[in-house]
Curated annotation (Swiss-Prot):
It catalyses: a chlorophyll + H2O = a chlorophyllide + phytol + H(+). Its EC number is 3.1.1.14. This is Chlorophyllase-1, chloroplastic. One of its GO terms (biological process) is chlorophyll catabolic process. A motif (GXSXG) lies at residues 145-149. It is found in: Plastid, Chloroplast. Belongs to the AB hydrolase superfamily. Lipase family. Pfam families: Chlorophyllase. The keyword Chloroplast applies. GO terms for molecular function: chlorophyllase activity. The keyword Ligase does not apply. Pathway: Porphyrin-containing compound metabolism; chlorophyll degradation. It is an enzyme of class 3 (hydrolase).
Length: 329
């Protein structure tokens, strides 16, 4: 059976600014209350999901675009609850499968095939599990992934007609020479032209244990540079690490341990990082899905509107091949 949890917008405190400096609405919680729905493969829905799912959706009446989210290496999909809630509160339905739970993870090919099964389930299976009067626009779906899930998101975009792809510190292996299979970074250019946003981290390439969690040669820069046919944006969260988009204390013990001790983390609160990532995702999709470009273009023009420091912000418009670069000192 599906389980639902309600979440309502937090009440604001009059006269107390949420941020120390000016910001944009996308970096704060949106206008919609949200519902979190959990679905197991044993669900009586027809067809049942091929993998356990978390769905976070606006609770109000409306038609909303869909984001398929793919979790990071051996992490629980429950570990991203703050980001899911923020994005859904701005009018998106987030569908997050638990592709696997094992350490070490399965082969990247098996992970890709599992993600493909969920993508194929969406048109037939998603709508019947949503609240009454909440409609999913499955004709316009974005795929988004973190870490190794970012690699899977890009690989899936080479196979299916998604509306956009988003990589959150995507990783394609432990080094340039030990990539995952399928090795999509072996391509000089990805064979798609859909809009792309890639958000990297400044500390992802810094080793804490044996190796860095997002090593140079297999990280966000490599993915961005291969999107040669797409309108594409690139952001780097300078002072944050690979796991800093997760909840503060993931409920899953394994995810908690990986989050705290496996990767180099930033020294500041994770909340501004999560709000920054969520806000960029919302602004990007509002631009390319809804035609509302104001917030996204404002972030590109002046990254200081973000709640954290962003370096080397770059945007390339495929229609004109013009490049806008903003290096924040």
């Amino acid at each position: 059976m599906a389980a639902m949890v309600d979440s309502k917008p937090a009440a604001s405190v009059q006269g107390t600014p949420l941020l120390a400096t000016a910001t944009l609405p996308v970096f704060t919680r949106g206008i919609y209350s949200t519902k979190r729905i959990t679905l197991e493969t044993s669900s009586p829905s027809s067809p049942p999901p091929p993998k356990p799912l978390i769905i976070v959706t606006p609770a109000e009446k409306g038609t909303f675009n869909v984001i398929l989210f793919l979790h990071g290496t051996s992490l629980s999909n429950k570990s991203y609850s703050k980001i899911f809630d923020h994005i859904a509160s701005h009018g998106f339905i987030v569908v997050a499968p638990q592709l696997y739970t094992s350490i070490p993870p399965p082969s990247a090919t098996n992970e890709l095939n599992s993600a493909a099964e969920v993508a194929e389930w969406l048109p037939q299976g998603l709508q019947q599990n949503l609240p009454e009067n909440t409609e999913a626009n499955v004709s316009l779906v974005a795929v988004m992934g973190h870490s190794r899930g970012g690699q899977t998101a890009f690989a899936l975009s080479l196979r299916y007609g998604f509306g956009a792809v988003i990589g959150l510190d995507p990783v394609a292996g432990t080094s340039k020479t030990t990539g995952l299979d399928p090795s999509i970074l072996s391509f000089d250019s990805f064979d798609f032209s859909i809009p792309v946003t890639v958000i990297g981290t400044g500390l992802g390439g810094v080793a804490r244990c044996i190796t860095a969690c997002a090593p140079e040669g297999a990280n966000h820069e490599e993915f961005f540079n291969r999107c040669k046919n797409s309108s594409r944006a690139h952001f780097v969260a300078t002072d944050y690490g690979h796991m800093d988009i997760l909840d503060d204390n993931p409920s899953d013990v394994k995810s908690w341990a990986l989050s705290k001790y496996f990767c180099k983390n930033g020294n500041e609160s994770r909340d501004p990082m999560r709000r920054c990532v969520s806000g960029i995702v919302v602004a990007f999709l509002k631009d390319f899905f809804d035609g509302d470009a104001e917030d996204f273009r404002q972030i590109l023009k002046d990254p200081s509107f973000a709640p954290i420091k962003l370096d080397s912000v770059e945007y390339i418009d495929a229609s004109s091949m013009l490049t806008t670069t903003h290096v924040k000192v």
